[in-house]
Amino acid sequence: MFNNIIKNISKSIVGNEDRIKLTLAAIISEGSILIEDNPGSGKTTFAKSITLNLGLSFKRVQFTSDLLPSDILGFNIYKNEKLEFQKGPIFTNIVLADELNRGSPKSQSAFLEAMEEKSVSIDGETYRLPEPFFVIATQNPMDSSGTSSLPDSQLDRFMISYSLSDLNEIEKINMLKNGFDLLSIKSEPINWEDLQIKKKKVKVSDEIYKYVIEIEETIKSLDQNIHVSARCLKQIIDLAKGWAIVHGKDYVT
């Protein structure tokens, strides 16, 4: 199932097959992804290509310094003598949060809180986000102008973070020849419910659980100031299950 998706995405995003697989594994595990790279490196194109090939609804939010929380979450308006809630772009399966660290801390916080809770609270009313729901966020390096760094407590909400690979000469030639015609490479939509059933059946041995705890203990021994959260440990296991499914296996190795 995923071989075709990976093949299609690789037609427009060359030289990043491992990151494509890692992103799909995170999405299967209902985790969110943070891509950090320089402007013009293809972050947005990469994220769009992933979403188009999953057959899920998605919307893009361009973060800027003047973006308000209500521009993301939604707001109430008075219509026909009553308040009606107008949903923001966060009400979709996949949100592409473009240049997240260009937004104000207030907008970042509101967005990431909704991402964590998978719901939006406005004027005392709570609105659930669609299922499945996850975020593919991009950000520019901290030394780029107009950026504000995300605190560790917010970075912890992302399952994985990476930069895109540098292309070799052959890959650059292929990119220049083929361009970024994303609309022509869409795959068949995946069955999300079947996928979640399959994920629950993935076997994880006690040795794998012990190995994850060993990773935590090693990190702590190297730097006592680094805290490995329980959420992080769980996400490692979930990501491993997603990685197994991407590779057509029903067990974690």
Predicted regions mapped to residue ranges:
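Conserved alpha-helical scaffold flanking the Walker A/P-loop in AAA+ ATPase domains
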Residues: 21-25, 76-96, 100
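Basic, amphipathic alpha-helical bundle interface domains used for macromolecular binding and assembly
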Residues: 179-253
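Pre-Walker A (pre-P-loop) alpha-helix and adjacent loop at the N terminus of AAA/AAA+ ATPase modules
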Residues: 1-41
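P-loop (Walker A) phosphate-binding loop of NTP-binding proteins
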Residues: 38, 72, 138
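Walker A/P-loop
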Residues: 24-64
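Short beta-strand-centered segment that lines the nucleotide-binding/catalytic pocket of NTP-utilizing
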Residues: 57-69, 124-128
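Canonical AAA+ ATPase core
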Residues: 79-82, 99-107, 115-189, 194-201, ...
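Walker B catalytic acidic pair
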Residues: 37, 98-99, 110
